[in-house]
Swiss-Prot record:
Gene that this polypeptide is encoded by: ligA
Protein name in the entry: DNA ligase
Region ranges (Disordered): 528-548
Purpose: DNA ligase that catalyzes the formation of phosphodiester linkages between 5'-phosphoryl and 3'-hydroxyl groups in double-stranded DNA using NAD as a coenzyme and as the energy source for the reaction. It is essential for DNA replication and repair of damaged DNA.
Domain BRCT intervals: 731-810
EC number: 6.5.1.2
Stored PROSITE patterns: BRCT, DNA_LIGASE_N1, DNA_LIGASE_N2
Gene Ontology molecular functions: DNA ligase (NAD+) activity; metal ion binding
Family named by the database record: Belongs to the NAD-dependent DNA ligase family. LigA subfamily.
Species classification: Bacteria, Pseudomonadati, Pseudomonadota, Alphaproteobacteria, Hyphomicrobiales
Native species: Methylobacterium radiotolerans (strain ATCC 27329 / DSM 1819 / JCM 2831 / NBRC 15690 / NCIMB 10815 / 0-1)
Length: 810
């Protein structure tokens, strides 16, 4: 992965701007996690993902009240797919913190020493092992026999892939030797060698099937097959490097555990070594980096771990990662080639993603023919804040470019050689309509900068086929319409059959149509599996049994849909999947407006009263903000500060300097203020934007959504199909009513979202940070800084079991 430093935090960020950016970052991270862990088809590089994570952490550090309010704050991986049975990890599978240069590694070592209270001359051993680029897997052995195999999932709940794991040659069904504890959870990475990956892709190509992008995707897709015979046909490998639940300790050091694993027949990486000196650790990193091309499998860095397990226990965890471990990522690998075409892919959230079709070139031992171009600005050579990138050089068809494999996942075009640009080349014209549905594609105004967002998005929303499956999954989810049993498989079947294109279609489903679609999908998948694995057609008796099971499942599904014909208004608003309209904003809207017709009428009025672009731009000037903006509009921009205070807009030196820097000179500032004054928002707009629980960012997203006729029509059709009820009210008599509750650490009996929903239903406010005003902290395994804050402020701390007992009592 590219060695990428975090960008400096914009200290002029207001609380509202921070909340909006935090929400966008959280959504982007969760979507990236889903694509990487569930779909095995990432759309951004590791480096881009790390930048998102670091920006999120920067904002949390600057605005502590936001910490934990976004699901991405403490998320690990992604929710397990509904195609597999679920396994709750006895010990959560967390992720690692990252380092991108030597200084960050040195700071990690120093941080560990500070935490332990050790001086620099006290010996402290670290292991250093290659970071395998594959799929994390947890193997649970009971009395030495493989009992369960589960993927990481979201860190707390994974997918049961036991039958598939049994086909992996490196994974012993029975541990060798003796001395293993009764319960022994072994964790490691499933991967494919370069040679086996090439052979699999050759077979895919010969069969006319899509090729895998890289070994990691191929390994993940192979392990997560519904048919174990397909997994068995692919030569997956496994390295063990960690553990989960142990009924008894097996060693005193990380090194000792790995040695014990090896005696039990579990493969461990031979390039793992132990060091007591930071310089030696970094030298080992350089050796591994130099040797990576010849290893025969993909790695994307080196992982350092404190060797002493007693010290690991003392160091503990913070947020989503251990204090005692760090991943030191590799720099990117690059090559030069030619852009043969630029195409647009529409992402599942409506983003228009430009992709460069390249003349095939080998980068780091892998043939690359596609590379991400990120967004419209990146193609034009313009950054998110209008600054030039690549010195302003745009990217065109026919250009000779430098391609980088950042993190060995998604190749990226980094630079352009203008000396080789064809004389007849033309700038790329980015589409202003969605290639998938023809709806307008827009770049929303970023309230922090006053400039358009980097990503152009389709406004088709509910009717765009590229977004359809993901939108519908959100619609039926637990926090949306909560239609029991309606998993992603059913949604995919309905979309493929053309039975569902918008939410209202769910309430028009017919038994026979649904059954025909399910049978057709199963027969197609069965034929594909038989062709790949060489197995025979199932007997008719088995087919009849399956048909009977289908009938029962379909009846249950239709009954579940019917049971949701009455829905609270806040759930309906959240289920629509409108950007920036999360659960809290949906509740605020349902609280302010009596019913959907009233809300829709208010939206129409607000759309006619929106502020103009000059008003938005003035608000976005650093350090100006709403209060100063309004004084400028009322009193104008003074040439100096000699006028009486009541007659001038009181400006700080920094505000005055920023205004002049933004607009050019005093006359330009005054002209801009005059134009902004003529474009003030009307009262109908401010009803939404000035509401502290809604705000201007969510307001603009709401108006944009309903401005698209397709979306408005889809909502109208849905309202014709269901009865909308007032928002669910909290239980006033509950002992939790009006209390502030914070959850920290891993919850074992329910997910974080479920716990939050329970607390809110009982009238509590769930916060992401601890203060003296917090009433209760529920702490699970891995609780970190929030637990310390609770102890500092004298806040009551309870376990998850205690919390559930309190809930049962009301």
């Amino acid at each position: 992965m590219a060695a990428t430093k975090s960008e400096p935090l914009d200290l002029d960020l207001t609380a509202e701007e921070a909340r909006a950016e935090y929400a966008r970052l959280s959504d982007a991270i969760l979507e990236a996690d889903r694509l990487y862990y569930q779909e095995d088809a990432p759309e951004i590089s590791d480096a881009e993902y790390d930048r998102l994570r670091r920006r999120l952490e920067d904002i949390e550090a600057r605005f502590p009240d936001l910490a934990g309010t976004g699901a991405a704050s403490t998320s690990v991986g992604a929710k397990p797919s509904e195609k597999f049975a679920k396994v709750r990890h006895a010990v959560p599978m967390l992720s690692l913190g990252n380092a991108f240069d030597d200084a960050e590694v040195a700071e990690f070592v120093a941080r560990v020493r500070r935490f332990l209270g050790w001086s620099d001359d006290t010996p402290l051993a670290f292991t250093a092992e290659p970071k395998i680029d594959g799929l994390s897997l947890s193997l649970r052995y009971v009395n030495g026999r493989l009992d369960t195999a589960a993927t990481r999932g979201d860190g707390e709940v994974g997918e049961n892939v036991t039958a598939n794991a049994r086909t992996v040659q490196d994974i012993p069904a029975v541990l060798a030797g003796a001395g293993w504890p009764e319960i022994c959870e072994v964790r490691g990475e499933v991967y494919l060698s370069h040679a086996d990956f090439a052979a699999i892709n050759a077979r895919q190509e010969a069969a006319g099937k899509p090729l895998f992008a890289n070994p990691r995707n191929a390994a993940a897709g192979s392990l997560r097959q519904l048919d174990p015979a397909i997994t068995a046909s692919r030569p997956l490998r496994f390295f063990a490097y960690a553990w989960g639940e142990l009924s008894a300790p097996i060693a005193e050091t990380q090194t000792g555990v790995l040695e014990q694993f090896a005696t039990w027949g579990l493969p461990v990486n031979p390039r793992t070594e132990t060091f007591t000196d930071t310089a030696a650790m970094l030298a080992h990193y350089r050796r591994i980096e130099a040797d990576r091309a010849g290893l025969g499998y993909d790695i994307d860095g080196v992982v350092y771990k404190v060797d002493d397990l007693a010290l690991q226990k003392r160091l503990g965890f913070v947020s989503r990662s251990p204090r005692w471990a760090l991943a030191h990522k590799f720099a990117a690998q690059e090559a030069t080639t030619v852009v043969e075409d630029i195409v647009i892919n529409v992402g599942r959230t409506g983003s228009l993603n430009p992709l460069a079709k390249l003349r095939p070139v080998t980068v780091g031992g892998v043939v690359v023919s596609n590379a991400t171009l990120h967004n419209e600005g990146y193609v034009k050579g313009v950054g998110a804040d209008g600054e030039p990138i690549r010195d302003g050089r745009d990217i065109r068809v026919g250009d000779t470019v430098t391609v980088v494999r950042a993190g060995d996942v998604i190749p990226k075009v980094m630079d352009v050689d203008l000396t080789k640009r064809p004389a007849d080349s033309r700038p790329y014209a980015f589409p202003e309509s969605c290639p998938a549905c023809g709806s307008r594609a827009v770049r929303a105004i970023n309230p922090r900068t006053g400039r358009p967002d980097a990503v152009r998005r389709c406004t088709g929303g509910l009717i765009c086929p590229a977004q359809g499956v993901e939108r519908m999954k959100h619609f039926v989810s637990r926090n949306g319409f909560d239609i029991e049993g309606f998993g992603e498989t059913y949604i995919e079947v309905l979309f493929e059959a053309g039975l569902v294109r918008q939410p209202a279609d769910l309430f028009r489903l017919d038994f026979e149509e649904l059954k025909a679609a399910i049978v057709a999908r199963r027969e197609a998948l069965s034929a594909e599996r038989r062709a790949e694995s060489g197995t025979a057609e199932p007997p008719k008796k088995a087919a009849k049994k399956k048909g009977d099971e289908d009938d029962k499942a379909i009846k249950n599904l239709l009954a579940a849909v019917e049971a949701r014909r009455a829905v609270p208004m806040n759930r309906l608003l959240f289920a629509l999947g409108i950007p920036q309209i999360g659960e809290a904003t949906a509740k605020a809207l349902a609280k302010r407006f009596a019913d959907m017709p009233t809300l829709i009428a208010a939206i129409r009025e607000a759309a006619a009263a929106q502020p103009g672009p000059d008003w938005v731009e003035l608000t976005a000037v650093p350090r100006v903000g709403g209060t100063t903006r309004d004084r400028l509009l009322d009193l104008g921009f003074p040439e100096d500060d000699a006028a009486p205070a009541k007659e001038r807009a009181r400006l700080s030196a920094v505000q005055r300097e920023n205004l002049l820097a933004h607009y050019g000179d005093v006359d330009a500032v005054r002209a801009a203020i005059a134009q902004a004054a003529a474009q003030r928002p009307g009262d109908a707009y401010r009803v939404f934007a000035d509401d502290g629980e809604i705000g201007p960012v969510a307001t603009d997203a709401l108006l944009l959504f309903f401005s698209e006729p397709h979306n408005a029509d889809a909502v109208t059709a849905l309202l014709d199909a269901v009865a909308v009820q007032p928002m669910e009210r909290a239980a006033a008599a509950s002992t939790f009513a009006g209390k502030t509750v914070v959850f920290t650490g891993a919850l074992e009996k329910m997910t974080r979202n479920e716990a939050k929903a329970v607390a809110e239903r009982l009238g509590a406010k769930v916060s992401g940070s601890v203060s003296a005003k917090t009433d209760l902290v529920v702490a699970g395994p891995g609780a970190g800084s929030k637990l310390k804050d609770a102890q500092k402020h004298g806040v009551r701390v309870v376990s998850e079991d205690d919390w559930l007992a309190m809930v049962a009592q009301g």
